[in-house]
From Swiss-Prot:
The modification N-acetylalanine is found at A2. This is Serine/threonine-protein kinase PRP4 homolog. It is an enzyme of class 2 (transferase). Pfam families: Pkinase. The gene is PRP4K. Residues 687-1003 form the Protein kinase domain. The keyword ATP-binding applies. Residues 157-168, 562-581 have a biased composition (Low complexity). It comes from Pongo abelii. There is a cross-link at K99, K111, K117, K170, K177, K593, K659 (Glycyl lysine isopeptide (Lys-Gly) (interchain with G-Cter in SUMO2)). Residues 1-10 have a biased composition (Polar residues). The modification Phosphoserine is found at residues 8, 20, 23, 32, 87, 93, 131, 142, 144, 166, 239, 241, 257, 277, 283, 292, 294, 328, 354, 356, 366, 368, 387, 427, 431, 437, 518-520, 565, 569, 578, 580, 852. It is found in: Nucleus; Chromosome, Centromere, Kinetochore. Belongs to the protein kinase superfamily. CMGC Ser/Thr protein kinase family. Residues 518-533 have a biased composition (Acidic residues).
Length: 1007
């Protein structure tokens, strides 16, 4: 680096002379564009030679792909250029050769642009293109002026930014480089497509955009680090005309004054046709013909934009410093995955989107997307902010200057402006970020402000294309391409730059609500620099917006949860776009809350209503049949066996174990390592035990009050005191912490762990208190009948949310069953508990006895590798049991379990059987099922070989049973049957995914 700097410093005097000559020549119009470009690029390459070497390994894979792609394109199109430039290229490094390729491409595009410009000039003469292309070209014009202004500011010496801000700049430069590369890649694709369609006007826009973005990125490279800043300022000074240099030197000498500002503004308008840097000069000279047609319009507009961007820069740099969220890495990671499409907020319903399609289309076309892009990039650099005093003065001066022009221009401009305003209001509504920073300056269209959000990019083709029909067709295919090409890089970038403000702060996945009408008056005061009659219009729009927000607030609560027409979902629209996972989760969570509100005291009533639906005779018949089938859970298979007599005795301290074995280690631990609970004792000097819940394989559970937390009720799980159980307890502790950290807002229905401690060598885990598990609920309320369909629907929503969180954390629960699902007092909210069997998805040891038998998936039984699908299978079995009160597959052995599963779904696919480690226990060499049963007469085992197994169990008949269901409930039962069919697929690859389950009609549609 040092060597490069000294070398370039040595060359500077020579370059300055050359450049001054060049700029004098430029004023006389003597230097060709080619020469200026060559000089510019050669100088730049020399300067940044070492930086590219350091960067090499940072983004190698992405950039290599881009370079290959570019070279392929260029060599195809410009072979004749290469012949001409061969003599130059032979002695050059490959990096310089790519530069010359760029120049060759630019020349070629130059010719095309001249043709297009001629066509457009003809159209302009006839007055056809007032709103469309003309305004876009004007947008580019003012954009290049903005760049000139940036140079001037850099030269005037605004170096007040600290070192931290310079590092921030570095990060952003890296990002900007990547985005410009990606953009040029996808644009080159689009350009070839446009050429084949012979749509020249579009091609023209693309070309201009390509050039300006390229020049932009070149210039941004100059301000890389504080050590290089002086150099870049020299360069800016060189590339300007002598008169401007003289004037700016005078300015530096003087103290800043309001007149200074006036001089600056007037200089801008006078020296529009002077050159500021070779590349800007190109695009400007092209547009000059266009500019001369409506100079007043342009000047007014560009100044308008300039003053606004200044204010926005200063304001945003202030607010950004305050608003940097410190996020936990786990949360960051998850947001990267889930928040793919941030800027489509819940406020933006399909209805609102289509309020004024035509004018919006027009205004979108009439404004340069590049401009917004550039503005948003500038707004992040702290060195370009103005002091508040100067800002106010320049604003008032400009307002005075603009007044007469505005009167003249009101007619052609008002319509696009109005629509911009209305769109701004709409999007202001939609973006929750505004709620947090009312002082922040809004850009013209807040949705487009986040220049690096993938969604904004994917929308840009829609803005460019002309006819609405073509716009729709083009948008779908192009946005798909872009999203694919950018999502990977974007995600990596987002996680890397923690310094920058989080783009998705305030997105609804972080538990925020859609009510932003906080400071709409203040917001609007910032940009009401239009005429007085527009004030009334703004006020009117604001009132309309509030009405719409109110309407949708109620709609979100009342309307059916149908996928296409849900206003509260940001993505769902009539254009067959599937909702994002985040929207689905939001919607389901809202539904669960609503169910909780509505059914606080109705649980028992709904179960009784279900009892009444059963016909009396068949009820008697079923009870007689039921006597034959023993209750599968009377034994200690029950996780929290509240009715387990020896546990009650043990709780009372009457257990006979101690008397029988006087050589026990301690008085408080029994022979099996369980802690002897005494009602009334105090654990860890703060938990006063008042009740005994039950006992599981790993532990027993007591109810206690926390004296340190105002007698808050808790459940304390006391792990058995032996090595294996302690290990299991610590593993459960680790998984619970991971799950709780990933779900700070408690939306995903996994049990909350408060803390843990050791008591007399037993590990104790302190949980939130929950009254009973679903096994007990079924025994108490729904024995042989099951629960109401409304309750089953809500429970299924909550279970799928729990599965979603498990998958996010890469955890398998591996023991989901009604015993391990706890409910609150009102039976409206459930929590998945008991993570003693849980494992990381990668550590899935193949064992045929994982998961309780009735809920064990077929892939576990045959010894095939497994993943999240085993938990989905368990949930399916549990849901059937909740609705019917009966166990779906009450198999006595693994072999019997397979037989019952195949009775429902038909024979297991041979492809799946072959992958099983234990297939020989259940299938013969020809893959026929060997059904092992005990002969009732001889009571000996007999094997029946079954080559084909036809599904004989009718799920729907079992679900409906002997109920006389009303029509709405019958519909829900049919939906439940369909959902269970998809969950209980024998092949885990064909089983429904969690997201698909959350979108199923049974979950989405209310009763």
């Amino acid at each position: 680096m040092a060597a490069a700097e000294t070398q370039s410093l040595r060359e500077q005097p020579e370059m300055e002379d050359a450049n001054s000559e060049k700029s004098i020549n430029e004023e006389n119009g003597e230097v060709s564009e080619d020469q200026s470009q060559n000089k510019h690029s050669r100088h730049k390459k020399k300067k940044h030679k070492h930086r590219s070497k350091h960067k090499k390994h940072k983004h190698s894979s992405e950039e290599d792909k881009d370079k290959k792609h570019k070279h392929k394109h260029k060599h195809k199109k410009h072979k004749r250029k290469e012949v001409i430039d061969a003599s130059d290229k032979e002695g050059m490094s490959p990096a310089k050769r790519t530069k010359l390729d760029d120049l060759a491409l630019l020349e070629d595009l130059e010719k095309q642009r001249a043709l297009i410009k001629a066509e457009l000039d003809n159209e302009l003469m006839e007055g056809k293109v007032q709103s469309g292309m003309g305004l876009i070209l004007q947008g580019y014009e003012s954009g290049s002026e903005e760049e000139g202004e940036i140079h001037e500011k850099a030269r005037n010496g605004n170096r007040s930014s600290t070192r931290s801000s310079s590092t921030k700049g570095k990060l952003e430069l890296v990002d900007n480089k990547i985005t410009t590369k990606k953009r040029s890649k996808s644009r080159s694709k689009e350009r070839t497509r446009h050429r084949s369609d012979k749509k020249k006007s579009k091609g023209g826009i693309e070309i201009i955009k390509e050039k300006t973005t390229r020049s932009k990125s070149k210039e941004r490279k100059k301000s890389k680090s504080p050590s290089k800043r002086s150099k870049s300022q020299d360069q800016a000074r060189k590339s300007k005309s002598p008169t401007l240099r003289r004037r700016s030197q005078e300015k530096i000498g003087k103290a800043r004054s309001p007149t200074d500002d006036k001089v600056k503004i007037e200089d801008k308008s006078k020296s529009k046709d002077r050159k500021k840097s070779p590349i800007i000069n190109e695009s400007r000279s092209r547009d000059r013909g266009k500019k001369s047609r409506s100079p007043v319009d342009l000047r007014g507009k560009s100044k308008d934009r300039r003053s606004r961007s200044k204010e926005r820069k200063s304001k945003r740099s202030e607010t950004d410093k305050e608003k940097k969220p410190i996020k936990s890495p786990s949360k960051d990671a998850s947001s990267g995955k889930e928040n793919r499409s941030p800027s489509r907020r819940p406020g933006r319903s399909p209805k609102r989107r289509s309020l004024s399609p035509k004018p919006r289309d027009k205004s979108r076309r009439s404004r340069s997307p590049l401009l917004n892009d550039r503005r948003s990039k500038q707004s992040k650099s702290p060195s370009r902010t103005l002091s508040p005093g100067r800002r106010a003065k320049s604003r008032s001066l400009e307002r005075k200057r603009r007044e007469p022009e505005r009167r003249r221009l009101s007619s052609p401009r008002t319509r696009p402006r109005d629509d911009i305003l209305s769109r701004r209001e709409r999007s202001k509504d939609a973006s929750p970020i505004n709620r947090w920073s009312p002082t922040r300056r809004r850009s013209r269209s807040p949705i487009r402000r986040r220049s690096r959000s993938p969604l904004r990019r994917s929308r840009s083709p829609r803005r460019r294309s002309r006819s609405p029909r073509r716009r729709d067709r083009g948008r779908r295919s192009r946005s798909r391409l872009r999203r694919r090409s950018r999502s990977r890089g974007g995600r990596r970038r987002r996680s890397r730059s923690k310094v920058k403000e989080d783009k998705f702060k305030g997105s609804l996945s972080e538990g925020m609500k859609v009510e932003q009408e906080s400071s709409s008056d203040d917001n609007l005061e910032d940009f009401d620099v239009e005429e007085e009659d527009e004030e009334a219009l703004i006020e009117q729009r604001r009132i309309q917006r509030q009405a719409i927000v109110q309407k949708y607030k109620y709609l979100a609560e009342d309307s059916n949860m149908s996928v296409p027409s849900e206003p509260s979902s940001p993505q769902s629209s009539t254009r067959t776009r599937s909702p994002s996972p985040d929207d689905i989760l939001e919607r389901v969570a809202a539904d669960v809350k609503e169910y909780e509100r509505e059914n606080v005291d109705t649980f028992e009533a709904s179960v009784k209503a279900k009892h009444n639906l059963m016909t009396v005779e068949q009820n008697n018949g079923s009870s007689q049949k039921k006597l034959l089938a023993p209750d599968m859970f009377t034994e200690s298979d029950d996780m929290f066996a509240a009715y387990f007599d020896s546990a009650r005795l043990r709780a009372a301290g009457i257990g006979k174990d101690f008397k029988e074995n006087p050589n026990l280690r301690d008085n408080w631990t029994d022979a099996e390592g369980y802690y002897r609970v005494n009602i009334g004792e105090v654990l860890d000097k703060r938990y006063n035990v008042y009740g005994y819940t039950g006992q599981g394989v790993f532990s027993n559970v007591v109810r206690a009050r926390d004296n340190a937390r105002a007698s808050q009720e808790v459940a304390v799980k006391i792990i058995r005191n032996n090595e294996l159980m302690q290990k299991t307890g610590l593993k459960e502790l680790e998984f619970l912490k991971k799950l709780n950290d990933a779900d700070p807002d408690d939306k995903f229905h996994c049990l909350r762990l408060f803390r843990h401690f050791y008591h007399k060598q037993h590990l104790c885990l302190v949980f939130e208190p929950l009254s009973m598990n679903l096994r007990e609920v079924l025994k108490k309320y729904g024995k042989d009948v099951g629960l109401h369909i409304k309750a089953v629907r809500s429970y299924s929503q909550q279970l799928f949310l729990a599965l979603k969180l498990l998958k996010r954390c890469n955890i398998l629960h591996a023991d989901i069953k009604p015993d391990n699902i706890l409910v609150n007092e009102s039976k409206t909210i459930l929590k998945l508990c008991d993570f003693g069997s849980a494992s990381h998805v990668a550590d899935n040891d193949i064992t045929p006895y994982l998961v309780s038998r009735f809920y064990r998936a077929p892939e576990i039984i045959i010894g095939k590798s497994y993943d999240y699908g085993i938990d989905m299978w368990s949930v399916g079995c549990t849901l059937y049991e909740l609705y019917t009160g009966k166990i779906l597959f009450p198999g006595k052995t693994n072999n019997h379990m397979l037989k019952l599963a195949m009775d429902l779904k038909g024979k297991m696919p041979n492809k799946m059987i072959r992958k099983g480690v234990f297939k020989d226990q259940h299938f013969d060499p020809n893959l026929n099922f060997m059904y092992i049963e005990v002969d009732k007469v001889t009571e000996r085992e007999k094997v029946t070989v079954m080559s084909t197994i036809n599904p004989t169990k009718d799920l729907l008949a079992d679900l409906i049973g002997c109920q006389r269901l009303p029509e709405d409930q019958r519909k829900k039962v049919h939906q439940l049957k369909d959902l269970l069919d998809q969950i209980l697929m024998l092949d885990p690859a064909k089983r429904i995914s969690i997201n698909q389950a959350l979108q199923h009609a049974f979950i989405q549609e209310k009763i």
